[in-house]
From Swiss-Prot:
Induction: Expressed in the early phase of the viral replicative cycle. InterPro entries: Pox_A8. The keyword Transcription applies. It comes from Variola virus (isolate Human/India/Ind3/1967). This is Intermediate transcription factor 3 small subunit. The gene is OPG134. Belongs to the orthopoxvirus OPG134 family.
């Protein structure tokens, strides 16, 4: 019934040469973060399936979560499959639910940690989809208690650090009992350091709560980390006079140094990991 058109009935053979991947160069402004132009990552799936697939895409960066915790987060996302949260930006709902769920277990991320593990959330500049706006919207939609994600409560941020340096044999989801003394010690140092800055009028009040917390936590983490490296190198000890009630567990930090280094290196890759020399010098006065 139909006859082939000669001009279109063509065959071609394509020969591919050798390509050396090591010699390729990235494009200008190319970055490792993924930003969906259409806000739909898996448009051919239902929004529920899309959230789960998006969660798998994002959670692979949280390398310190074990399989039980990942399974728990998937169940939390599955529990709200019938809830319409956003009309367009469906793919970022999953990581926000994960962040709020982890926060409900006592672990929060500073701005630098968010940039390190969820750069898409940190780099969102539109007012509608900014981090704090999305947190408020999702809290309201899911019936969570409304409130700011970043508050002057330092334990949750150091609990995330504890998650990252956990012993492989820890039992239970988000269990940091073995590292609880480290959380208490780092938190006490940060609270006292924050009060010192308040008394000296060194806190930048124009900055957001998240930015102030980020600066405090980053300063304490990098100072403790660098002192730890000197201790390991020289086989010595150090103490911090700000840790009055909970002394720093140096042995624990030495034992987990490899994991601690991996976590610190992830933070150092971010643009928000900026340490004030003045703050660091002030804090170092309390280390001997």
């Amino acid at each position: 019934m139909f006859e082939p058109v000669p001009d279109l009935n063509l065959e071609a053979s394509v020969e591919l040469g050798e390509v050396n991947i090591d010699q390729t160069t990235p494009m200008i402004k190319e970055n490792i973060g993924f930003i969906s132009r259409s806000r739909r990552l898996f448009a051919h799936r239902s929004k529920d399936d899309e959230r789960k697939l998006a969660l798998r895409f994002f959670l692979q960066r949280l390398y310190f979560l074990d399989h039980r915790e990942i399974h728990y987060l998937f169940r939390c996302v599955d529990a709200v499959k019938d809830v319409t949260i956003t009309k367009k930006n469906n793919i970022i709902v999953a990581p926000y639910i994960a962040l709020l769920t982890i926060a409900s277990k006592g672990c929060k991320l500073t701005e630098t940690m968010i940039e390190a593990f969820f750069p898409e959330l940190y780099n969102e500049h539109s007012k509608k989809f900014k981090f704090n706006s999305q947190v408020s919207i999702i809290q309201e939609k899911l019936g969570y208690q409304s409130g700011n994600y970043h508050v002057y409560d330092f334990e949750p941020y150091y609990s995330t650090v504890a998650l990252a340096i956990r012993d492989e044999h820890s039992s239970g989801i988000f269990n940091i009992r073995q590292e609880s003394y480290l959380v208490s010690s780092l938190s006490e140092i940060t609270y006292r350091f924050y009060l010192i800055n308040l008394k000296s009028d060194l806190v930048q009040w124009s900055a957001s709560t998240g930015a102030v917390i980020n600066q405090m936590v980053n300063t304490v983490l990098i100072t403790v980390y660098e002192k730890l490296q000197l201790v390991i190198e020289n086989d010595s000890q150090f103490i911090c006079s700000l840790a009055v009630e909970s002394e720093l567990p140096i042995k624990l930090l030495k034992d987990r140094n490899e994991l601690f280094t991996k976590f610190i290196n992830e933070l150092k890759k971010t643009s928000s990991f900026k340490i004030s020399k003045r703050d660091k010098d002030t804090l170092l006065k309390y280390f001997t």
